[in-house]
Curated annotation (Swiss-Prot):
The protein's role, per its UniProt record: Capsid protein self-assembles to form rod-shaped virions about 21,6 nm in diameter for the narrow nes and 22,4 for the wide ones, and 110-150 nm in length depending on the size of the encapsidated RNA. They display a helical symmetry of 23.2 subunits per turn of the viral helix and with a central canal enclosing the viral genomic RNA.
Cellular component terms (Gene Ontology): helical viral capsid
Listed name of the protein: Capsid protein
More info: The genome of this virus consists of three linear, positive, single-stranded RNAs encapsidated in separate virions designated RNA-alpha, RNA-beta and RNA-gamma. Three proteins (alpha-A, beta-A and gamma-A) are translated directly from these genomic RNAs and the remaining proteins encoded on RNA-beta (beta-B, beta-C and beta-D) and RNA-gamma (gamma-B) are expressed via three subgenomic messenger RNAs.
Organism name: Barley stripe mosaic virus
Gene3D superfamilies, sorted: Tobacco mosaic virus-like, coat protein
One of the Pfam families matching this protein, by short name: TMV_coat
Quaternary context: Interacts with itself.
Keyword rRNA processing: no
Top-rank lineage group of the source organism: Viruses
């Protein structure tokens, strides 16, 4: 479900000139806006991946593709806020969003690209190691062991790289936004039309 679904259309709008300058032209749409709970769940999923298993590695891209990242606001949709009256049983507090900048987005892209390592080359190396040899003596087994080691090394390297990138993501201090933070930092004013104009 996209983040904008947490907003409601109508009841007012942001000043268009402010929106165009401080949001559109400033590239705020290009950043990723991820709900705090969704981000924490995403990291939990990444921590659960066994990167040494090829079938598990493909899950990285799947988790990333499923991550909602759109801006939870528009010129006629106020940034997602609290729902209901505070203190009432149906009250829902204002959702919080992490704002991911270009550097963090690049880290996530790099993480998903680690899953694109080809498997055919390693299979070829293993097949080559199984070819019949004219000399069945014990020394002939040494090349086979070397080829096997060369086969697993790329996977070990990428698994180690995956852990490093994951640690960077977990330790990153991402800015947190609520409606108040968003409107204050971007200097946006929400206009409510007069009753006679509605």
């Amino acid at each position: 479900m996209p983040n904008v679904s947490l907003t409601a259309k109508g009841g007012g709008h942001y000043i268009e000139d402010q929106w165009d300058t401080q949001v559109v032209e400033a590239g705020v749409f290009d950043d990723w806006w991820v709900h705090v709970e969704a981000w924490n769940k995403f990291l939990d999923n990444l921590r659960g991946i066994n990167f040494s298993v090829a079938s598990s590695r493909s899950q990285v891209a799947e988790y990333l593709a499923a991550l909602d990242r759109d801006l939870p606001a528009d010129v006629d949709r106020r940034f997602a806020g609290a729902r209901g009256q505070i203190g009432s049983p149906n009250y829902l507090p204002a959702p919080k969003f992490f704002r991911l900048d270009k550097r963090t987005i690049a880290e996530l892209t790099r993480l998903s690209r680690l899953t694109d390592q080809p498997h055919n080359n390693r299979d070829i190396e293993l097949n080559r190691a199984k070819r019949a040899t004219t000399n069945p003596s014990p020394p002939a087994q040494a090349p086979s062991e070397n080829l096997t080691l060369r086969d697993v090394q790329p996977l070990k390297d990428s698994a180690l790289h995956y852990q490093y990138v994951l640690i960077d993501l977990q330790s990153a201090r991402l800015p947190v936004y609520t409606r108040k933070t968003f409107e204050r930092e971007l200097a946006l004013e929400w206009i409510i039309p007069d009753a006679e104009e509605a």
